[in-house]
């Protein structure tokens, strides 16, 4: 499991665009980013799982059962790889279709957000400026107290804390006033953005393409079922003999252990 966590952490820390940066490839599409993440995760699961299977086979119980788990694990990995290859084109077609059909909504929302951002930016700048002024206003009051702490003994710490509490409470109260003032100024824009979002969602709901998209999604799921059915059946057929062998050997070991207990 550590390998899985490490792989996912590396992907998030480096970003799925790392390959584009180093190799100067074209920027990845959303589907490519999802596919890369899924591939890294699945590969990590397979690798870590194979490691655990190998450890079990080398154990005393694994040698006694002789299940050939590694061989079956590799077969499973090969079958799963074929399943990924079959799903790729169909899923990408569906993703591209979804992205294309909702592109207009994304553009409108980005336009709305940019418009609101330009209107509220002066208020945000004003808030930041006032907050910096408040911090500078309290700095001369706090710095002498810090010097006293460095120069004084431990017994002065409690006295220093008492002096800091009123200053901290005063700064907190003034910050709340600025936050409340900012919230009041931004409220109309928040309501405006919420109303616009409601309008966009209503337009999306009334769009004739929505019914068409629902039909596409249904057809996509149907295609996925048709594509994966043969491969899943092959996987099931391949695992059944191994599962039956596992069951038989486990029962054999259990019977042997029971007989030993009865003879004691």
Curated annotation (Swiss-Prot):
Keywords: Cholesterol metabolism, Glycoprotein, HDL, Lipid metabolism, Lipid transport, Lipoprotein, Oxidation, Palmitate, Phosphoprotein, Repeat, Secreted, Signal, Steroid metabolism, Sterol metabolism, Transport. Residues 1-18 form the signal peptide. Glycosylated. Sequence repeats lie at residues 67-88, 89-110, 111-121, 122-143, 144-165, 166-187, 188-207, 208-229, 230-240, 241-264. Transmembrane segments: none annotated. GO terms for molecular function: amyloid-beta binding; apolipoprotein A-I receptor binding; chemorepellent activity; cholesterol binding; cholesterol transfer activity; enzyme binding; heat shock protein binding; high-density lipoprotein particle binding. Participates in the reverse transport of cholesterol from tissues to the liver for excretion by promoting cholesterol efflux from tissues and by acting as a cofactor for the lecithin cholesterol acyltransferase (LCAT). As part of the SPAP complex, activates spermatozoa motility. Belongs to the apolipoprotein A1/A4/E family. Homodimer. Interacts with APOA1BP and CLU. Component of a sperm activating protein complex (SPAP), consisting of APOA1, an immunoglobulin heavy chain, an immunoglobulin light chain and albumin. Interacts with NDRG1. Interacts with SCGB3A2. Interacts with NAXE and YJEFN3. This is Apolipoprotein A-I. It comes from Nannospalax galili. The gene is Apoa1.
């Amino acid at each position: 499991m550590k390998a899985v966590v490490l792989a996912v952490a590396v992907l998030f820390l480096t970003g799925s665009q790392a390959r584009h940066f180093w190799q100067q490839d074209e920027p990845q599409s959303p589907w490519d980013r999802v596919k890369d993440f899924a591939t890294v995760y699945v590969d990590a699961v397979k690798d870590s799982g194979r490691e655990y299977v190998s450890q079990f086979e080398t154990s005393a119980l694994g040698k006694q059962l002789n299940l050939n788990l590694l061989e079956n694990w590799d077969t499973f990995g090969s079958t799963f790889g074929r399943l990924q290859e079959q799903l790729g084109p169909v899923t990408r077609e569906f993703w591209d279709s979804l992205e294309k059909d909702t592109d207009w909504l994304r553009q409108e929302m980005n336009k709305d957000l940019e418009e609101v951002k330009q209107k509220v930016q002066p208020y945000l700048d004003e808030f930041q400026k006032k907050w910096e002024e408040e911090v500078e206003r309290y700095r001369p009051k706090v710095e002498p107290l810090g010097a006293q702490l460095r120069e004084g003994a431990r017994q002065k710490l409690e006295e220093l804390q008492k002096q800091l509490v009123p200053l901290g409470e005063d700064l907190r109260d003034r910050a709340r006033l600025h936050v409340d003032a900012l919230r009041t100024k931004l409220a109309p824009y928040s309501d405006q953005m919420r109303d616009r979002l409601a309008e966009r969602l209503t337009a999306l709901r009334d769009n004739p393409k929505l019914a068409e998209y629902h039909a596409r999604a249904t057809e996509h799921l149907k295609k996925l079922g048709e594509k994966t059915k043969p491969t899943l059946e092959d996987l099931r057929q391949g695992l059944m003999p191994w599962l039956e062998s596992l069951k038989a050997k486990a029962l054999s070991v259990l019977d042997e252990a029971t007989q030993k207990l009865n003879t004691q």
